[in-house]
Every structure is written in C-alpha cells, then in structure tokens.
Amino acid sequence: MPLSLSKDKIRVLLLENVNDSAVRLFEANGYSEVERLKKALGPDELKRRLAGVHMLGIRSRTQLTADVLEAADRLIAVGCFSVGTNQVELDAARRVGIPVFNAPFSNTRSVAELTIAEIVMLFRKIFPRSVSAHDGGWDKSADGSREVRGKTLGIVGYGNIGSQLSNLAEAMGMCVIFFDQTDKLRHGNTEPVETLDELLASSDVVSLHVPETPATANMIGERELRQMKAGACLINNSRGTVVDLDALAGALASGHLAGAAVDVFPVEPASNTDRFVSPLQGLSNVILTPHVGGSTEEAQDRIGGEVARKLIDYSDVGSTFGAVNFPQVQLPARPTGTRFIHVHRNVPGVLRQVNDAVARHGINILAQYLQTDPEVGYVVLETDVVGGEGEALLADLRDVEGTIRVRVLYDHDRPVTK
C-alpha cells in the first residue's frame, strides 16, 4: 500500500468564485476532487466544509482565523487568490504547519491602468459631466479641464504597481516623482524625493501604493492633506486604512483639493448585496469604485493560474516558493525514491533526530533540504525506496520532539502520485 495519498483522493475547496483557470490547472494535473463555491463562508460553515479538505482557495472575504485553522484536520495548504493575505492569520497557519500562498504581482497592470484612467477622468472632470449628461444637462466647457501632459504625478510606494504606473504616466508626458521608505531602482526619468511632505507639496496628483501596516495607518490625514498643492488630486488604490476619509472629505468640500478617486475603504461590505457607506458619498468631485482595482478578467486569470500552480507544486514536490509565512524551498521531483516533508518548531536537535530515525531503518538519504525562519523549520527528505520500512519510519518522524506535521509526497517508483 503506498504511503502517499493519490491525487484523486486529495480534496480541493475553492471559495468566492475563484477563476476557471485554477480549476483547469488542478484538473490538468490530476486533481479531480475540486469543489468550487461562488460565495464566502462564515466561520461555522467554513469549519464544517473544511472537514476532510486538503487544500483551500479563498479570495478576500473569507476569514481564516486561528480557530478555523486548528479545526481543519486535513488541511495542508491555503491559497489566497488575491494580492493580499490580510484575511488569514498567518502566524496561526505557520504554527500548525500550513503554508499560505498568494499572487502578489498578477494584478499589477490592472491597478496601474485604473489609476491612469482616474487621473485623466479627474483632470478632465469627466465624472460630474457624465452625471450631468445622464440627467439631461449639457456642461460643454473647458473650465477646470486640464491635460495630464506636463503635470507632476507623485507616487507613494514605488513597488511593482508604483513602478508600472510610472512607466505609463511617463509615456503620457507626465513628470513622475516617488517616495519610498527603501531605496528603489528608478524607471525612466522618474525622480525620488527625500520625504513624503516634499512629494505632497510638489505633486499635481498623488497616488498611493503602499501595504497595510501599522506605519501606513492613516498616513494621509488632515496635516498631510494640507501639505498638498491647492487644486491637486488624491488617488488611493492601495489599502483602505491608509487615508483618513473624514479628513479627505473635508479637504474636498473646502475646495483645497480638486478631486479624488478611492477604490479601497476601511470597512467594506461583506457581499455585493450589503449597503456601502462612506463620508465621500455625495461629493461630485470624487470617483468611488468598489475595490475593483485588480478585478479584470486578465488579472483574475493570471491569479487563478499562479496560485493554483503554487499549491500544486507544494502538494506534488514540497516547494514552498512564494509562501508568505513559511521557509522558502524550491526543488524538482526525482524519478524514483521516496520524498518526506517534516515541519517542526525551530529548536536545536530536530534535524539530528530526523536523520537518526532514517538511519535506524537502514534507509539511505539521497538529498536533504532544510530552511528555517525564527519559529519553524522545514525539511524535505529524499530517500531510497523505503519498502516495508515506510510506515515505521513515518511513525518515527512523527514522534520527533518538536514535530508539527509530516507527510509523504511520493513513494516507491511512483513519482508525484501524491
């Protein structure tokens, strides 16, 4: 009887209408037990649904708490089919030996394109003119309508999205400056500035592209808004906690800022049927969108394929490359032999105990990979065919002090049968 679980026995649960590309990739790689639901699940229903599930895929609404993770008796990996992973308690997942994967760059182009579109819309005052036309008005005027060419775009956070945005903006003739906490290689003629205040005071439009951290909470408040040029615009397509929306509403209502575009909010509806409330509602110079910056068909297709591939690679060969909460190991499959993975607390002596267990059974180690972080160690162990010693060795590895979990990925002469 093989030690590893065959792929047709591995259960995959995908929530929140994960893209078809993920389902296709799982099925093309031999995973036939794939269930996909359109909705997010609350904690109690999620616990029930996770019984017997090996891999879980979610987007942004399903919340994976420590309580849920500890109740998932068979869960080996989580895929966040999104850029962020705020919906998962990452430390809790690591403590129970569950790596979490995401797609940090797959929607970069989509967010950058939306930002460019919003810059043009704000500078031309298209939104209020469109509303007026729908209401029967005819506001044909050049007053307050400006070209973007020659204007200064200030980018806060010069990462993947910020740098992509700078390329698009420069192609349209904009001058681009950026502020980042770390040194970044600049693209084209983009110029870094030393402080956030300098960027705010110099920009005709400011676009925010920073992560959600304690340092970025309300980083744009009343003081920072006063630092911005009179008549400037603000765009936030990053995280909802970055801007004090009450302060922004005041700056817009007073006329200090000419306009704003906001795609993310501190509190967002849990579903498309829930009511959305914001202090920015009713302001004609504000473009409000329902967190759709990365929601294009192309981005969702890329995200589906990228996250599914990472889950498959972990299940098939033990690769944790791209996991956000786990030691990073990337390695190919071997055509023969047996591959074990051993997740343990990062304490002295575990690797010695693992090797001693293998030696006691007279099994030869062909290759061994170890990576650690401050809390967790991850060993991938490649051995000769273990034969009848496999079950006993597996039991001994589970008995190693500090062990979190042990699995066999493939065994005997059946490579990657899982």
What is the meaning of each model-derived region?
Residues 1-101, 199-201, 221-223, 227, ...:
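An N-terminal-biased, well-structured beta-alpha scaffold segment characteristic
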Residues 14-16, 104, 149-170, 342-354:
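Glycine-rich adenosine-cofactor-binding loop
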Residues 61, 204, 209-212, 238-239, ...:
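Short glycine-/small-residue-rich Rossmann-like dinucleotide-binding loops
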Residues 63, 84-87, 102, 106, ...:
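Residue-level detector of alpha-helix initiation sites
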Residues 96-152, 164-171, 319-323:
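Phosphate-binding beta-alpha-beta segment of Rossmann-like dinucleotide-binding domains, i.e.
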Residues 100, 222, 231-334, 361, ...:
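Rossmann-like dinucleotide-binding domain for NAD(H)/NADP(H)
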Residues 321-418:
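A conserved regulatory-domain signal marking ACT and ACT-like small-molecule sensing domains
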